[in-house]
């Protein structure tokens, strides 16, 4: 059962990231003729396309894709907590999972951008889209940071902010997990340290 739950939650999270990429690319006004952008659009169009005819966009935000991402997080929350009936806490957990997924997506985009800057050196179409995605987030930080002799520390600052936010979200997710089913929230955290684990078993 745990293996199936892990597989389902992983597949849902990966697809949620692809949907969020679509929202992010529209917000950042990325080149949608780029091969990578076309992949994201084609992968999400079967679900997002029909909703876009009903739900209008909110300025640069693709509200239909954002709604799909939230629904996927609701499903993931139900899978993680193994709850059949809808409880109010599920919606809170889904929102927190959505925020956590957004943070993870930003982190992986920054990491891939850093790796590809060494490997492809600007020749890859994927790197071009990653730079377009990251620029709206990094530009305000660059404006605040003083000049560091040509070294860009804005990605490090953003990763640090994401880490702090992720820690806070993880704490709240643990609390909501314990409210739903005692002990379930612990699955969302890191395992106990060996010394602590040993003391627990000794008791």
Task: Locate predicted features.
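Selective transmembrane helix interface/packing segments
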Residues: 1-203
